[in-house]
From Swiss-Prot:
SMART domains: Pro_CA. Binds 1 zinc ion per subunit. The keyword RNA-binding does not apply. It comes from the Bacteria. The gene is yvdA. Reversible hydration of carbon dioxide. Belongs to the beta-class carbonic anhydrase family. It catalyses: hydrogencarbonate + H(+) = CO2 + H2O. This is Putative carbonic anhydrase YvdA. It holds the Pfam family Pro_CA.
Amino acid sequence: MNQMVSLTSILEHNQRFVSEKKYEPYKTTKFPSKKLVIVTCMDTRLTELLPQAMGLKNGDAKIVKNAGAIVSHPFGSVMRSILVAIYELQAEEVCIVGHHECGMSGLNASSILEKAKERGVEDSCLNLLTSAGLDLKTWLTGFHSVEESVSHSVNMIKNHPLLPKKVPVHGLVIHPETGKLDVVINGYETELINNHS
């Protein structure tokens, strides 16, 4: 592996970037100008595509990334980030943006655990985690339908006891080649239904 080559290259580029003041066009505040927090996937195809497809530029939104755009625990780091964005950083809406052809679709925990063993993680470590109550197979399992996964995450956020009831939570799926967005859940419509019931 060429870790040192990558880090060296990054640091060389960074030195030029700073000395040539290439950061100037990216200056903004920590507050998202579009009052939006987005949870999306770490897929490399979305790095530039997603902001372009959503009409976002630097400073418009808080973007939280993880494997699969999944909110897997109501008190995990993703949910904490959403709450911080809302209460401390002036975000007023949440978008979960999953994508087609996601690596988390059909992810098999056994495959990951085998690869971990091949790279030096010992059975004794896995056994210790299991005996401590961690269900590795569930924790490392993906989803079967991106739409269902997005809906599940939206519902977990929307029903969180610390989320203000008036915050719209949208669920979208993006195509990683074209950037086409499909709406799974329109948070405005959900809000209208809740206000009339």
